[in-house]
Amino acid sequence: MTHEPHPGAGAERGIMVVVVGPSGAGKDTLMNLAARHFSGRADVHFTRRVITRHRGAGGEDHLSVSLQGFAAMEQSGSFAVWWEAHGLKYGIPAEVSVALSKGHIVVANGSRSALHRFQAAFPRLKVINVTASAEVLAGRLEARGRETHEDIMARLARGPLTVRGDYDVTELDNSGSIEEAEQKMIAILDGLLAEVH
């Protein structure tokens, strides 16, 4: 379930980059490596999502809030985009619009199901779809130990890993070495930096 974007977002000169992909594809790892690579640059921002998930639950670095806290933030216009998925609520802070208005790049961990909301909020939207082979995904998910083998197989059988819709999508296959995928991610972001400068 997704919801309306923040009404003030939209007049940005920069590029909103939304990283999507299935669990186990390596989105968080690649975003962390890219953030480290671009850490000295003032024109590339990696935003943390606000999530109604306990901070110690694992996964990405995020701002953890209660359902009540999330609702208050949504009501006050604190999100550029927010959505629900897998029983949790996710939000992208509205302040990303400040960086975008300066012609910067903002990178966020998103969701394929919420891309139409990102597109409505950000006129210059690029999507990086991180994928990996089913065998690699299964191995990574099993290594996490959060799901049974049967649950993992059911997850992988749910459907294609492609992005559906009219979006500017770059595919990034992370089936090989993390170093190779990191270089691909950096090259994609370098290309987008060239577009805004």
UniProtKB/Swiss-Prot annotation:
Family assignment from sequence similarity: Belongs to the ribose 1,5-bisphosphokinase family.
GO cellular component, one term: cytosol
Entries under Pfam families matching the protein: Guanylate_kin
Function (record text): Catalyzes the phosphorylation of ribose 1,5-bisphosphate to 5-phospho-D-ribosyl alpha-1-diphosphate (PRPP).
Gene3D superfamilies named in the record: P-loop containing nucleotide triphosphate hydrolases
Gene Ontology molecular-function annotations: ATP binding; ribose 1,5-bisphosphate phosphokinase activity
Protein's gene: phnN
Catalysed transformations (reactions): alpha-D-ribose 1,5-bisphosphate + ATP = 5-phospho-alpha-D-ribose 1-diphosphate + ADP
Pathway linked to the protein: Metabolic intermediate biosynthesis; 5-phospho-alpha-D-ribose 1-diphosphate biosynthesis; 5-phospho-alpha-D-ribose 1-diphosphate from D-ribose 5-phosphate (route II): step 3/3
Species in which this protein is naturally found: Rhizobium etli (strain CIAT 652)
GO BP field: 5-phosphoribose 1-diphosphate biosynthetic process; organic phosphonate metabolic process
EC number of the protein: 2.7.4.23
Binding site for ATP: G21, P22, S23, G24, A25, G26, K27, D28
Record keywords, A-Z: ATP-binding, Nucleotide-binding, Transferase
InterPro entries reported in the protein's UniProt record: GK/Ca_channel_bsu (IPR008145), Guanylate_kin-like_dom (IPR008144), P-loop_NTPase (IPR027417), PhnN (IPR012699)
Protein name: Ribose 1,5-bisphosphate phosphokinase PhnN
